[in-house]
């Protein structure tokens, strides 16, 4: 993020460029993207298992509780999608490649920093629970953050070195020196958080009192996320950049030092820019000047007034308005009710699918959820005025396509994906919210290939995850086994268990059973973290499930939540689900695990019964019985009744030792066998 090497440079000179703060009794504008990455990577969370979202949520809650204790009022500003120019695409692709390498490293036991897939959604859910004010910008948030902080005369909290360039009235506090875990007290009563604040005045003073207005030119010459022109190397190689007196630390920042010392000789950006252009071929000067000036604008005040959103709920973004998007979409994006994935698809007809810690030798885990995305794309087709106006009714038909940047092996590629043609009343995005709840729910469930009746016994909070699980089970590329399904459903019991434990008026016996089961789950989770090797096939299967859940949630949000959004903070824990997989494979049975808590046992039965009818019959076969399809068909053709009898006998034996729902599975197997022979 930001300018390469600048953050480490200013930190090497922290005594000169930073002042100590005792932060309390103030507003603070927080870079949400930087914060959730920092909390994810600096809190000893295990990143191998696809997200311990409960642990992450606890860390986020503690962070904001520290702020509240110091009477610090946070305003979180999140990045949105890419802007219409898509000028960061090269940078985003480079980062995608880096993430693939880090995900691969994590998958084979190495180190790396890869955010779990749903971390942003979890972060937003915690903000909502804690009633922390937040906004999601239409595109990148940096300028809006700077403008709001200057309006309120308060500091910015981030880790982005771009904030060393912005002229902030009250300064910029880097996250890595923001000691929220080490609250101190003044006179025994007033809490404060020790922090460091970057001083732009001290920075400019260090470089011969250079004009602050030169810093945006420095940023684009040095190379930031927006500009990386090969021709600038011509300037850097020809200009004799003065390094000044450098310490051993300074040698690794020779380009930064040289540029700053060189720029400090000029009175203003115009004079400096003219001198830059002298080193370039004449034929390139005009184009380079235009690009540099345009990039320097990124460090000026934003036209967006976020204070209006926080005070009145009004979000006005000129760039978004110019696209002519429906009002309800703009409002939902600002409130974080729609993901930046949606705005990227809307504005650019291009999305980037993030890599998870998965099996790099298999097709990427997002392939399984592509049909859901095709429905999302179909809903978005008629809402991008700047794109081709090709009609679905044109002859010959020319379906409008979207591009997806996805992982292939350990690299990326761009795939062209056709949107699904939808009924006329579904294809007008501006009127999508006018559809009845029943019709919106029907479209969601039809996409997930799930009957509504299946979900009737399921608690409201789990309807969407169970519908998604049914979708996941129906896809042959999933390769899920029974213990994968069982582990997933057991993990979904955590939220209800916490509700029982915290519910007043529950009988002591019920509460004790819930506490014991919850404690057992915590033990399994802790034990998993001590393990050394990741089961890559299992990891890939659960990455596929998370992709289905993410896209199911995005479709649900786009349809104005016909099913309630699940509480992700208590729905999925990667360490727990992997640990349960290991236990169920070894010796533990679901029956014995749930025997201490009848309420959890009953809920599990509802969840299992809902999903089992969508699972392939093979996953219910005992170990050693899952032969190839051809062998099963051959045996069925030679002796239908004999085969059915053997299957029943083996399954009953498995049921008696392991799972009380086995009889239900036997009935399902017999029906499946009879249906196969009728065909």
UniProtKB/Swiss-Prot annotation:
Residues 625-645 are annotated as: Disordered. GO terms for biological process: double-strand break repair via homologous recombination; double-strand break repair via nonhomologous end joining. Residues 626-635 have a biased composition (Basic residues). InterPro entries: Asteroid (IPR026832), PIN-like_dom_sf (IPR029060), XPG_DNA_repair_N (IPR006085). It comes from the Eukaryota. SUPFAM superfamilies: PIN domain-like. One of its GO terms (molecular function) is single-stranded DNA endodeoxyribonuclease activity. Its EC number is 3.1.-.-. Gene3D superfamilies: 5'-nuclease. Keywords: Hydrolase. Residues 351-400 are annotated as: Interaction with SHLD2. Belongs to the asteroid family. Interacts with SHLD1, SHLD2, SHLD3, RIF1 and MAD2L2/REV7. PANTHER family: ASTEROID PROTEIN, PROTEIN ASTEROID HOMOLOG 1. Structure-specific DNA endonuclease that specifically cleaves single-stranded DNA and 3' overhang DNA. Contributes to the control of DNA double-strand break repair choice by antagonizing BRCA1-dependent homologous recombination (HR) and promoting non-homologous end-joining (NHEJ). Recruited to the single-stranded DNA ends by SHLD2 and cleaves the 3' exposed DNA ends, therefore inhibiting DNA end resection (necessary for HR) and promoting DNA end protection (necessary for NHEJ). This is Single-strand DNA endonuclease ASTE1. It comes from Homo sapiens. The lineage of its organism: Eukaryota, Metazoa, Chordata, Craniata, Vertebrata. The gene is ASTE1.
């Amino acid at each position: 993020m930001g300018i390469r090497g600048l953050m480490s440079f200013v930190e090497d000179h922290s005594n000169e460029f930073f002042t100590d703060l005792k932060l309390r009794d103030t507003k603070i504008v927080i870079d949400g993207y930087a914060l959730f990455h920092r909390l994810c990577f600096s809190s000893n969370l295990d990143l191998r298992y696809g997200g311990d979202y409960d642990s992450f949520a606890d860390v986020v809650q503690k962070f904001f509780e520290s702020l509240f204790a110091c009477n610090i009022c946070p305003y979180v500003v999140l990045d949105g999608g890419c802007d219409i120019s898509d000028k960061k695409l090269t940078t985003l692709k480079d980062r995608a490649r880096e993430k693939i390498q880090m995900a691969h490293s994590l998958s084979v036991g190495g180190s790396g920093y890869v955010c779990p897939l749903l971390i942003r959604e979890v972060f937003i859910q915690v903000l909502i629970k804690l009633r922390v004010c937040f906004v999601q910008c239409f595109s990148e948030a940096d300028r809006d953050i700077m403008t709001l902080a200057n309006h309120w005369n308060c500091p910015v909290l981030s880790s982005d070195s771009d904030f060393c360039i912005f002229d902030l009235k009250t300064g910029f506090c880097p996250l890595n020196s923001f000691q929220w875990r080490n609250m101190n007290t003044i006179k025994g009563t007033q809490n404060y958080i020790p922090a460091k604040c970057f001083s732009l005045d001290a920075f400019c003073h260090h470089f011969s009192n250079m004009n602050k207005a030169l810093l945006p030119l420095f940023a684009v010459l040095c190379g930031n996320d927006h500009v990386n022109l090969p021709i600038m190397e011509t300037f850097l190689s020809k200009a004799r950049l003065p390094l000044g007196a450098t310490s051993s630390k300074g040698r690794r920042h020779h380009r930064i030092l040289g540029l700053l010392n060189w720029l400090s000789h000029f009175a203003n950006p115009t004079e400096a820019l003219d001198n830059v252009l002298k080193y370039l071929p004449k034929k390139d000067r005009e184009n380079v000047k235009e690009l540099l000036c345009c990039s320097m604008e990124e460090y000026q005040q934003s036209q967006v007034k976020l204070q209006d959103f926080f005070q009145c709920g009004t979000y006005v973004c000129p760039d978004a308005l110019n696209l002519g998007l429906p009002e309800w979409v703009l409002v939902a994006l600002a409130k974080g009710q729609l993901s930046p994935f949606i705005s990227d698809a809307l504005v650019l007809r291009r999305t980037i699918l993030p890599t998870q810690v998965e099996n790099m030798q298999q097709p990427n885990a997002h392939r399984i959820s592509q049909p859901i995305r095709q429905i999302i794309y179909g809903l978005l087709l008629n809402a991008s005025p700047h794109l081709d106006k090709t009609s679905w009714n044109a002859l010959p038909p020319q379906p409008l396509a979207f591009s997806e940047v996805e992982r292939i092996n350990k690299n990326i590629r761009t795939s062209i994906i056709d949107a699904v043609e939808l009924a006329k009343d579904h294809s007008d995005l501006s009127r999508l919210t006018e559809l009845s709840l029943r019709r919106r729910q029907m479209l969601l469930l039809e996409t997930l290939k799930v009957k509504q009746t299946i979900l009737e016994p399921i608690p409201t909070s789990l309807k969407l995850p169970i519908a998604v699980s049914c979708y996941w089970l129906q896809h042959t590329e999933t390769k899920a086994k029974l213990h994968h399904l069982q582990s997933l459903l057991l993990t979904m019991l955590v939220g209800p268990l916490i509700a029982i434990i915290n519910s007043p008026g529950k009988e002591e016996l019920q509460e004790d059973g819930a506490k014991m089961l919850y404690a057992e789950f915590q033990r399994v989770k802790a034990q998993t973290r001590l393990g050394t090797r990741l089961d890559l096939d299992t990891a890939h299967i659960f990455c596929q499930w998370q992709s289905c859940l993410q896209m199911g949630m995005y479709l649900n949000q786009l349809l104005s939540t016909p099913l309630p959004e699940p509480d992700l903070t208590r729905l999925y824990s990667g360490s727990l689900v992997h640990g349960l997989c290991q236990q169920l494979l070894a010796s533990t049975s679901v029956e014995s695990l749930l025997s201490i808590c009848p309420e959890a046992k009953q809920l599990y039965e509802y969840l299992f019964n809902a999903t089992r009818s969508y699972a392939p019959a093979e996953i219910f076969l005992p170990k050693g019985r899952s032969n190839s399809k051809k062998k099963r068909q051959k045996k069925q053709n030679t002796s239908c009744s004999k085969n059915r009898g053997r299957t029943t006998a083996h399954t009953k034996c498995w049921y008696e030792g392991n799972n009380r729902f086995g009889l239900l599975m036997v009935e399902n197997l017999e029906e499946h066998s009879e249906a196969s022979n009728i065909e």
